[in-house]
């Protein structure tokens, strides 16, 4: 029902039955359906007439059959009484005085009620001795009437009633009828009072303690609250609180600390308001430096060295156009050798790119689109730095990335410039006037005047080779060379590679060189490895040296030929 005060169909059926002096009777005829959705059939008997109806509940079925009976019943219906109308009754049970107060607040005019004395009656005394019809001994008192004067702004209204409250309601009702249709007057604040009114409105919502702290903060004055006295029985305590604000102080008393603190703040607040107002200080305006907008260049030379995908996107943003649209067209090739084809679309322009993965294909497609739009190709930033020589980020050693492999043949040992210079100096100092030649087995046991002649010990040549490789000079070779007395024609400088080849040939270092390479590949120390090999197989080296010397015995003119070959090589 929309209105709870409206009568239901069953209530109206009961009124109809009372009016016709019959008894309504409801009967539950049937109940069917599952437990969660049952249907009930109800029968209503009113006099000689019966009606049936169904509903999801017994109550709903009764209401439905009652509605059916009201529409189809032939019994005479009672006349509906009109609702009582009372002028003083307002909708929503709001009294006229309350409604008038709200209207008066909107208008900014207070409503003031003043009671008035009733008019005095004439001084008339009846004849109490005559007991006639019109002169009874005991007279009924005249009913008293109350009068009220209501003032709303410049308007005055009078009300009367049996009680003082009824008189007030009567006056408020007359004021409402007169003021409801009048426009609300506009109140313009007077000069000099508007600011005070605004401040008063703001301060009205703040407590006295908050106002004290605000004033003290503006004037840089310290604030302190202290309970100085506490007296009275436990159920009726009395507290005295002292507040100090700079040079001002006040005390407040109350039955709680909060109340005493509030009263003390109220007292000191009155003294603080007497202080002269603070001078108005204009704050300097803050000037914020505007940041320049990020300039996105869209020239043909912009972005060289950037990623083509980012470069193409920035160019489109600078043009305020739609960003590039990338689509994967196809994927072809063997499982381990895939090839992706990516398409990029910028406006009406379309370009494609291929690559072993989607990222490279997308990059190539963006590069092709840049070339198609008339921009220069993107070059690597590292290549640009190498060309221009600009590497301002780091001047120290480069990070330990793997160095690119060179095309040097295997088995060739590179000597540093320092080692090479020492070897050249020692060679000029010691070898000048000596001859180079291959040693025969006959000369193994004889001291030779040549530079690489071997001492009677079997491992002297190995010692010379090791010293030359490690230090660049050989003290053993110098000692042997000093013993030689036969002068020989000077030989032109020999290349270090030839020297190393000669040492390896006479010592049989082919296996040792490969072992050094294996040691370097395994991360071991090649010198220690070579020394271990030499210490473990000295006898084998001596035997191998004799065989090499027999096979490679050179004629006397071989030294000159070697010198010529070395000169031509240099």
Curated annotation (Swiss-Prot):
Give the start-end ranges of region Disordered.
71-94, 181-203, 387-409, 528-570
Q: Which residues carry this modification: Phosphothreonine?
A: 405
Q: Where is the composition biased (Polar residues)?
A: 83-94
Phosphoserine modification sites are 188, 395, 416, 426, 440, 455, 492
Q: Which GO terms describe its cellular component?
A: axon; cytoplasmic stress granule; dendrite cytoplasm; dendritic shaft; endoplasmic reticulum; glutamatergic synapse; membrane; microtubule
Q: Where does it live in the cell?
A: Cytoplasm; Nucleus; Nucleus, Nucleolus; Endoplasmic reticulum
Pfam families for this protein: dsrm (PF00035), Staufen_C (PF16482)
User: According to the UniProt entry, where does the motif Nuclear localization signal 2 sit in this chain?
Assistant: 373-412
Motif Nuclear localization signal 1 location, chain numbering: 273-291
InterPro entries for the chain: DRBM-containing_protein, dsRBD_dom, STAU2_DSRM_2, STAU2_DSRM_3, STAU2_DSRM_4, Staufen_C
Q: What is known of its domains?
A: The DRBM 3 domain appears to be the major RNA-binding determinant. This domain also mediates interaction with XPO5 and is required for XPO1/CRM1-independent nuclear export.
Q: What does this protein do?
A: RNA-binding protein required for the microtubule-dependent transport of neuronal RNA from the cell body to the dendrite. As protein synthesis occurs within the dendrite, the localization of specific mRNAs to dendrites may be a prerequisite for neurite outgrowth and plasticity at sites distant from the cell body.
Q: Whom does it interact with, and what assembly results?
A: Interacts with the exportin XPO5. This requires RNA and RAN bound to GTP. Interacts with microtubules. Isoform 2 and isoform 3 may also interact with ribosomes, and this association is independent of translation. Identified in a mRNP complex, at least composed of DHX9, DDX3X, ELAVL1, HNRNPU, IGF2BP1, ILF3, PABPC1, PCBP2, PTBP2, STAU1, STAU2, SYNCRIP and YBX1. Interacts with TRIM71 (via NHL repeats) in an RNA-dependent manner.
What name goes with this protein? Answer: Double-stranded RNA-binding protein Staufen homolog 2
Gene behind the chain? STAU2
């Amino acid at each position: 029902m929309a209105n709870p005060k409206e009568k239901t169909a069953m209530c109206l059926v009961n009124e109809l039955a009372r009016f016709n002096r019959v008894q309504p009777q409801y009967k539950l005829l049937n109940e069917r359906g599952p437990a969660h959705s049952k249907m009930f059939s109800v029968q209503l008997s009113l006099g000689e007439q019966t009606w049936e109806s169904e509903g999801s509940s017994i109550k709903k079925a009764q209401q439905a059959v009652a509605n059916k009976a009201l529409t189809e019943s032939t019994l005479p219906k009672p006349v509906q009484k009109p609702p009582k109308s009372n002028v003083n009754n307002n909708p929503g049970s709001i009294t006229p005085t309350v409604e008038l107060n709200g209207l008066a607040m909107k208008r900014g005019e207070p409503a003031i009620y003043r009671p008035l004395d009733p008019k005095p009656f004439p001084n008339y005394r009846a004849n109490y001795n005559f007991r006639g019809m019109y002169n009874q001994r005991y007279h009924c008192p005249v009913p008293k009437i109350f009068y009220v004067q209501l003032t709303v702004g410049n308007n005055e209204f009078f009300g009367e009633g049996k009680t003082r409250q009824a008189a007030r309601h009567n006056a408020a009702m007359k004021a409402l009828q007169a003021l409801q249709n009048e426009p609300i007057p506009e109140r313009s604040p007077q000069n000099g009072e508007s600011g005070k009114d605004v401040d008063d409105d703001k301060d009205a919502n703040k407590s006295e303690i908050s106002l004290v702290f605000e004033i003290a903060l503006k004037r840089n004055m310290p604030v302190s609250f202290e309970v100085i006295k506490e007296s009275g029985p436990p159920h009726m305590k009395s507290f005295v609180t002292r507040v100090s604000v700079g040079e001002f102080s006040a005390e407040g008393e109350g039955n709680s600390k909060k109340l005493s603190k509030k009263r003390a703040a109220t007292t000191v607040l009155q003294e603080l308001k007497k202080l002269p107002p603070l001078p108005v200080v204009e704050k300097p305006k803050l000037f914020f430096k505007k940041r320049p907008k990020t300039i996105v260049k869209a020239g043909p030379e912009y972005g060289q060295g950037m990623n083509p995908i980012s470069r193409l996107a920035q160019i489109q943003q600078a043009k305020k156009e739609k960003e590039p649209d990338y689509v994967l067209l196809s994927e072809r090739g063997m499982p381990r050798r895939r090839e992706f084809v990516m398409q990029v679309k910028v406006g009406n322009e379309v370009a494609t790119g291929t690559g072993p993965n989607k990222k490279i294909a997308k990059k190539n497609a963006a590069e092709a689109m840049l070339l198609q739009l008339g921009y220069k190709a993107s070059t690597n930033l590292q290549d640009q730095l190498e060309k221009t020589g600009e590497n301002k980020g780091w001047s120290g050693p480069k990070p330990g990335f793997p160095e690119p492999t060179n095309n040097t043949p295997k088995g060739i040992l590179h000597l540093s410039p320092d080692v090479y210079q020492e070897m050249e100096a020692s060679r000029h100092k010691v070898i000048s006037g000596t001859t180079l030649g291959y040693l025969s087995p006959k000369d193994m046991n004889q001291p030779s005047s040549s530079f690489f002649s071997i001492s009677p010990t079997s491992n002297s040549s190995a010692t010379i080779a090791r010293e030359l490789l490690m230090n660049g000079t050989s003290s053993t070779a110098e000692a042997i060379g000093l013993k030689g007395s036969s002068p020989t024609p000077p030989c032109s400088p020999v290349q270090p590679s030839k020297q190393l080849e000669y040492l390896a040939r006479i010592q049989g270092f082919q296996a040792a060189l490969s072992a050094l390479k294996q040691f370097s590949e395994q991360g071991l120390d090649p010198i220690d490895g070579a020394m271990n090999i030499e210490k473990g197989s000295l006898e084998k080296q001596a035997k191998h040296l004799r065989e090499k010397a027999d096979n490679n015995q050179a004629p006397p003119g071989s030294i000159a030929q070697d010198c010529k070959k070395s000169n031509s090589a240099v």
